Amino acid sequence: MAVENAINFREICSLLDISESYKCTINAFLDNVEKCTDKHYNDALNLLDTFFSNEVKSNSLVNDLIFCIINSNFDFLKVFKSNKLRLENLQIVYESAFNENKPFLKEFSAKDKINKEVKKNLYSTPAVTRFAPEPSGCLHIGHLKALLVNYNLAEKSNGTLLLRFDDTNPVKNYEKYEKEILRDLDTLGITGLKISHSSDYFELLVDEAVSLINKNLAYVDNTDQETMRIERFEGIESKMRNINNSESLKIFKELLQGRAPGYCLRAKIDMSNPNKSMRDPVIYRASDKMHGRCKLYKAFPTYDFVCPIVDSIEGVTVVCRANEYKDRNEQYKWFLENLELENKPEFNDFSKLNLEDTVLSKRKIDKLISDSLVTGWDDPRLATIQGIKRLGMHMTALKDYINLQGASNKTNVISWDKIWAMNKKVIDPLSPRFMAVEKINCVRVFITNFEGLKYTKNIPLNKKNTSLGSKDVLFSDTLLFSQEDGFVLKENEEFTLMNWGNAIVEKKVVENSIVTELYIKLHLEGDYKSTTNKISWVSESGAVTATGIEYGKLLVNEEFNINSKIDKQYYVESSITNLSTDMKHVQFERIGFFYCDSPCVFHLVPFTKQKRTY
């Protein structure tokens, strides 16, 4: 469940005519649900089960609310169903609410079937869809579902995806981020799109606004923002609502020239409509800034006014957008009808992508950048397309995971571990293997029976995928082990040197609890199956120094995590310098998978760090 959904449930709870004990229990229940882990889900369920076991009088309002909370979150519902036999009291409440709500569930199910049929029909003719980001920042994972739903529909129906930059806010400098968004799309493999800007249609949008004024369907208003907010909430008509059209038109023209401060233009729809988006929305607002691409005006259209008009003009046939905009669909249709626009797109709503512990707010990201807490929009700790790419996300895995979620209206919170698990499956066969040793307190290892000069041996870069090519491994009489491996080996122990064979520890030198040297002799005829410890190593001669960076959570308890970036130095086998530039993922054996961000700088891919067992 997304946190915003939980907050809505809190608001509902606060409005219900129920006792304070009910309200306190439900809020405590939601505290656990918001944390989105199986442990907290179980805690939440046990809390309610205990509450209902204390001979609490049944309340149908509470039962319905709890039923809605449990059913609104697929992951939570799964946990509940797996535990329902021991949640005896809660099960009684749930089943009671389930039986009472059966008619509504059937109706919802029927609507869902209709929606599936509508979506099936979408593919029968070429669809024209659009992706309309505001170029005020780079694309992040939150944009990705909207992008892919629109892209996939266009692809599957042999249609067209339009890219429209929503540049209606003159205060913002859009040019920089337009280039960044095109770069993001290229990274995702989405290219060759027809590009337009909302500002391309500013003159036409002015004409449409004038048309609404002349039809007595729009009026200028100088009500202050706070009063307007209250009036819209309470359904109170503005004092300016019935201004005559000629006066409204005169002031609107002054507004466009920056000579009517404090005014805006509102659509005259229906202030008593239960859908608040229909309560005379603002469609033009003043600005003291000139637009970068259009120097004619000092008042600019709102997103809700632009979309239906430009969608219709550009030939969009299906508007695919998150269901958080669903209330605005009625408003969208009102503009199409009252402006007599011929092309009327259909709607395909889907649930917003919700991710746990993820900063997606542009305002928050800008603040982190300005405070120098992150390096920019492509910082690997940010969930931007470039950020997660630098963290080791393969775009195939990312797109596949998002596509698996489909265009459903069901709200789920996505756990990063699931995305990274899919990513590992993609990068594993594509990743060359290299041995690496952490530099700090590394152990020098001397082979007492090494014969002759150092030599190289050619082996596959990835034994599971020999098509990646091969590498030369350097064998010499002096090796480097990690302190961790040096510490665990005992004198006279036989162990296995990876990619070489068995060896026996002859002597172990320890100073101040730190292993400094090992003396070993090769025993290559030994059986590697009989050894407990398989040790990765690097020849001291020719070892390359590389930086490995491990990134953690950006925020902890809403505060910046000062430990969100940890640098380590490694000695890596010399053949890594011959790595092809198109091989961006590697595995440091027994350490984890890494993304090559720049020469000899590697970022640890999340959830691939290997736990050592001895």
From Swiss-Prot:
GO terms for biological process: glutamyl-tRNA aminoacylation. A motif ('HIGH' region) lies at residues 135-144. It catalyses: tRNA(Glu) + L-glutamate + ATP = L-glutamyl-tRNA(Glu) + AMP + diphosphate. InterPro entries: aa-tRNA-synth_I_CS, Gln/Glu-tRNA_Ligase, Glu-tRNA-synth_arc/euk, Glu/Gln-tRNA-synth, Glu/Gln-tRNA-synth_Ib_cat-dom, Glu/Gln-tRNA-synth_Ib_codon-bd, Glu_tRNA_lig_a-bdl, Ribosomal_bL25/Gln-tRNA_synth. Keywords: Aminoacyl-tRNA synthetase, ATP-binding, Cytoplasm, Ligase, Nucleotide-binding, Protein biosynthesis. ATP binds at residues 140, 324, 359-363. A motif ('KMSKS' region) lies at residues 359-363. It holds the Pfam family tRNA-synt_1c_C. PROSITE patterns: AA_TRNA_LIGASE_I (PS00178). It is found in: Cytoplasm. It is an enzyme of class 6 (ligase). Its main location: cytoplasm. Its EC number is 6.1.1.17. GO terms for molecular function: ATP binding; glutamate-tRNA ligase activity. One of its GO terms (cellular component) is cytosol. HAMAP family: Glu_tRNA_synth_type2 (MF_02076). Belongs to the class-I aminoacyl-tRNA synthetase family. Glutamate--tRNA ligase type 2 subfamily. This is Probable glutamate--tRNA ligase, cytoplasmic. It comes from Vairimorpha ceranae (strain BRL01). The lineage of its organism: Eukaryota, Fungi, Fungi incertae sedis, Microsporidia, Nosematidae.
